[in-house]
Regions:
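Gram-negative bacterial Sec-dependent N-terminal signal peptides
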Residues: 1-18
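Proteolytic maturation boundary segments
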Residues: 12, 18-37, 217-256, 267, ...
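Histidine-acidic residue clusters that define the catalytic metal-binding segment
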Residues: 20-29, 150, 168-208, 236-244, ...
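M16 family metallopeptidases and their MPP-like homologs
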Residues: 40, 45-71, 85-129, 159-185, ...
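Conserved GTPase G-domain substructure that encodes guanine base recognition and part of the catalytic core
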Residues: 70, 284, 732
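Extracytoplasmic/secreted cell-surface and envelope-processing proteins
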Residues: 85, 218-222, 276, 332-333, ...
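Non-catalytic, conformational "gating/processing" segments within enzyme and secreted inhibitor domains
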Residues: 144, 164, 193-228, 420-421, ...
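Short, conserved secondary-structure transition motifs
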Residues: 148-154, 244-258, 361-370, 562, ...
Length: 882
């Protein structure tokens, strides 16, 4: 009743039109200036997401300037009148640094996920940026360098190259013919005036939809929105581009790739999100992606390394992708022929009715899972309103429910015409082995110290003046079954679903006999073949009957409507404890793994990682073991079964259950499903041993498909996951390379435009630690960027961080702990990680107190004691640095 009264009262504060809904948790309003607002109350966590959707993207850009909308998105982070760049970055960092933007075809999104108490600040930022943005020539010249690094990064991806060519052919003559990324030549011609014109034309309240989800007071929130946005004037919008899709012609694309396996692909044009046939296309896509379908079966029968199907939907059209993998040197023509045969059958004979029914039911059930994440819920509402031009995420439910097998088959016949297909073959190629570097020079004086103290706008100062411990709203129950299996339960009532994740703590490089490397990978692939009581198709049909998603292996998961939780857990346990492991399936999976490894061990990514690990760890370290075609070819089914028996133990397993379930019911169901599982013998040690300091070195791994270098500076550190100093290291790493306001980002991107992104991280294990800094840049900028990295690390050792930096980093770390509760998935994975490390489930509260008490001297001392600026291994993947 209180929610209803509150909803009715909102009509008094909108100053514009108000539309009631049947859901008391959903509030809608349209301000007088045309801004549409949707507020969805979600009490999952003390967290809120704001998504500002501007109904303009790469569709609306001028001819010849495909990246204009993308560039404007970048410049929105360079500041606005009344909100400087430094202020914006400081605010974003203070709120937890969970902010970003995304440019799509017809929509550009700006989103914040923040603790609830920071909602007002997030709204102030959005309103300020709608009013105007700073787009001076000097700022654009700097940001152009960063965005061109992003272009280089994506153009280094063979998949992106494929998508670019595909779109050019599939959507010729329409705005969809190009991606929104942009090109270097077009950015070289783009001026700051061009960008300002785009912003001033399209960034208007009557061309925007603001979605707010989280634990908020709808009435107070809407009042804030009106106060901040209500006086922004509406604008007269230009005509939007039209879409006149021409009949597709069959085309073939051939590309080299640095992927470890080859890919044969087929693509067709699908209906879009706003088309009448969208629901049918969605069900068709899900049916063809079914684990009971012939495409998925390709990866289980030996006809391909894998078979996948996906539908990618834009407002006015979609793309259907069918992919099949083949080993390096394999017969791509044969794989392609098998792939084509599947879709010829779908076009002429239709899709099996039972797969259509299961796909339809699963699509309806999946709507409920969108409620299990605060930012995910905002995305769902944004997609429904801004992309699909619908009323809510649920308004597609009736359309999906009405889809019939006959409609699906009619669409399949129309879509999968071979004369309309685009075919692609991505063939793995060698780029050469890693080679030692000659050292890196560079100007020592380039750049400068990070920005000094930033004075925040008055409307933001109070929010960050005082540090507060985060509100941790989770209250898990934990129990251990008689067989040693740990179960953690976090009840949540925001949806009628339950999500389960679990892990068996294993390590094949410590547990598998020498010469059997890869046994764990073959074992995990065999969980797709059903159980000892149900074959593969029967097992998947049982999951489909309860609209559940399940995976098994050393890591396992289940997502199921809460009414089917018991049955879902029974099926998960049956798969985990009684995998069928048929001999024929073993032979196929062994062959597939062998073929995949033949390409993997020659791929630039693998060679790069192998060489880096070899430079960090001593000879003979178990972390240097890896599977080879020979080690996998030598395995027997008995080897795999023995490894399973020895390593899959309940006393090495944790299960986390989050959702619409009580601890008592979860305990009862878990005991019934997993209680019969037994362990024999002493518990194994699955943790790598401690290692000494590494020696400094440099090397380059060639990658012929890359135009940009991926650079890692890494070294071993005398710290592990239980070291008392880890909190100082984490906080210091946050200041050094943890976000837009970090030293590295300021020096390498904001001031110099050398890189698109740069970050630092400390990866700690039970007995060893590793500190890394990663960035991507052009080959001629590697040395210059590295010089700045080393300088900034030394600065952390030589000079205490400022009070302002420490305060901001603490605020960010404290808020990030609150943001870790924003979804079922993040809650479950956090608890699973803590359990696997043997830490208490209230470790976040303990960490918060440690961060609150941290001093600049403690951070400086840890960096001085544990980091070695002259000890980094510099690993470059891509063209040789110049």
């Amino acid at each position: 009743m209180l929610r209803l009264v509150g909803a009715i009262s909102l009509t008094l504060v909108t100053g514009g039109a108000f539309a009631a809904t049947n859901d008391a948790n959903v509030t809608r309003a349209t301000l007088d200036n045309g801004l549409r607002v949707v507020i969805v109350r979600d009490t999952l966590a003390p967290v809120v997401t704001t998504e500002m959707n501007y109904l303009a993207g790469s569709d609306e850009v001028p001819v010849g300037f495909p990246g204009t909308a993308h560039a404007v998105e970048h410049m929105m982070f360079r500041g606005s009148p009344g909100l400087s760049k430094d202020q914006l970055l400081a605010i974003a960092s203070d709120m937890g640094d969970s902010f970003n933007a995304d440019t799509t075809e017809g929509v550009t999104q700006y989103f914040f996920t923040v603790p609830t108490q920071d909602l007002g600040v997030a709204l102030h930022v959005a309103a300020t940026r709608m009013r105007g943005v700073d787009m001076g020539a000097a700022d654009w010249n700097k940001e152009r360098g960063a965005i061109e690094q992003e272009v280089s990064r994506d153009n280094s991806s063979p998949i992106y190259k494929f998508i670019t060519q595909l779109r050019g052919q599939m959507f010729a003559g329409t705005p969809y013919a190009h991606t929104g990324l942009g090109t270097r030549p077009s950015f070289d011609k783009t001026t700051a005036t061009d960008l300002r014109k785009f912003h001033d034309t399209w960034y208007a309240p009557n061309n925007a939809i603001l979605v707010i989800t989280g634990d908020v007071d709808p009435g107070a929130t809407l009042q804030q929105v009106k106060q901040l946005f209500g006086d922004i004037p509406r604008k007269t919008l230009p005509a939007r581009p039209s879409f006149d899709f021409k009949p597709m012609q069959a085309q073939t694309i051939a590309l080299p790739t640095d992927l470890p396996v080859g890919v044969a692909a087929l693509a067709w044009r699908l209906p879009g999100l706003r088309d009448q046939d969208y629901a049918t296309a969605l069900v068709l896509s899900d049916a063809l992606a079914s684990k009971r379908g012939k495409l998925f079966e390709m990866g289980l029968s030996g006809k391909a390394l894998f078979g996948q199907f996906a539908g990618s939907f834009m407002p006015h059209a979609g793309i259907a992708f069918a992919l099949a993998g083949f080993p390096r040197g394999g017969d791509s023509a044969k794989v392609l022929k098998n792939l084509q045969a599947i879709f010829a059958e779908a076009a002429t004979q239709g899709v099996p009715a039972d797969l259509v029914t299961a796909a339809r039911n699963n699509a309806i059930a999946d709507l409920e899972y969108k409620k299990n994440s605060v930012p995910g819920l905002a995305n769902a509402w944004s997609e429904a309103l801004a992309f699909r031009d619908g009323h809510s995420p649920d308004d597609i439910r009736a359309a999906i429910a009405a889809v019939t097998p006959e409609q699906v088959n009619a669409l399949a016949k129309r879509i999968f015409d071979p004369s309309h297909a685009i075919t692609a073959i991505l063939t793995p190629t060698s780029s050469g082995k890693p080679s030692a570097g000659k050292g890196f020079g560079g100007a020592e004086s380039f750049g400068g110290a990070p920005s000094g103290t930033v004075t925040l706008p008055t409307w933001a100062q109070a929010a960050f003046a005082k540090l507060e411990l985060p509100r941790i709203s989770t209250n898990p129950s934990e129990f251990t079954l008689s067989n040693g299996l740990k179960v953690i339960v976090q009840p949540e009532t925001v949806s009628k679903t339950v999500e389960v994740i679990g892990k068996v703590q294993t390590n094949q490089y410590l547990q598998a006999p020498k010469g059997q490397e890869g046994v764990a990978d073959v074992l995990n692939s065999l969980f797709n073949f059903g159980t000892t009581s149900m074959n593969r198709l029967q097992f998947q049909a049982a999951l489909d009957a309860i609209s559940a998603h399940e995976s098994a292996g050393s890591s396992f998961s289940l997502a199921v409507p809460s009414t089917n939780f018991k049955k879902g857990m029974q099926l998960l346990a049956d798969n985990e404890l009684h995998p069928a492991m048929p001999a024929q399936a073993f032979a196929v999976m062994q062959h597939n793994q062998e073929g995949a490894l033949a390409g993997l061990i020659q791929s630039p990514g693998f060679l790069h990682t192998l060489h880096l690990d070899g430079a960090l760890y001593p000879a003979g370290d178990p972390d240097l073991r890896h599977a080879t075609p020979k080690s996998v070819a030598g395995l027997t089914l008995a080897d795999v079964q023995h490894y399973y028996t020895q390593t899959f133990r309940p006393d090495m397993t944790t299960i986390v259950i989050v959702g619409d379930i009580t601890p008592a019911d979860a305990h009862k169901v878990a005991e019934a499903a997993f209680g019969s599982w037994k362990a024999a013998g002493p518990k194994p040690d699955t943790h790598y041993p401690a290692v000494p300091d590494n020696k400094a070195s440099e090397f380059n791994t060639p990658d012929s498909s890359a135009v940009q270098d991926s650079v890692t500076l890494a070294e071993t550190i005398p710290m592990d996951e239980n070291s008392p100093d880890r909190f100082a290291m984490y906080l210091g790493s946050q200041i050094l390379g943890g976000g837009f306001d970090a030293h590295l980002m300021q020096d390498l991107r904001v001031k110099a435009g050398l890189v698109y992104g740069v970050s630092s991280s400390a990866r700690l294990q039970k007995h060893r630690g590793r500190f890394s800094i990663d960035y991507g840049c052009d080959p001629d900028k590697v040395a210059e960027a590295r010089t700045l990295v080393i300088r900034d690390v030394k600065q952390m050792q030589d000079t205490p961080v400022t009070d302002a930096e420490l305060h901001a980093a603490k605020g960010k770390m404290l808020r990030s702990l609150a943001l870790g509760q924003s979804s079922f998935d993040s809650i479950a994975n956090n608890f699973l990680s803590l359990s696997m490390q043997g830490k208490p489930l209230d470790a976040d509260s303990i960490a918060a107190k440690k961060y609150m008490a941290m001093t600049a001297a403690e951070i400086q001392a840890v960096f001085e004691k544990d980091l070695r600026p002259g000890g980094f291994v510099t690993a470059v993947k891509g063209p040789a640095p110049k």
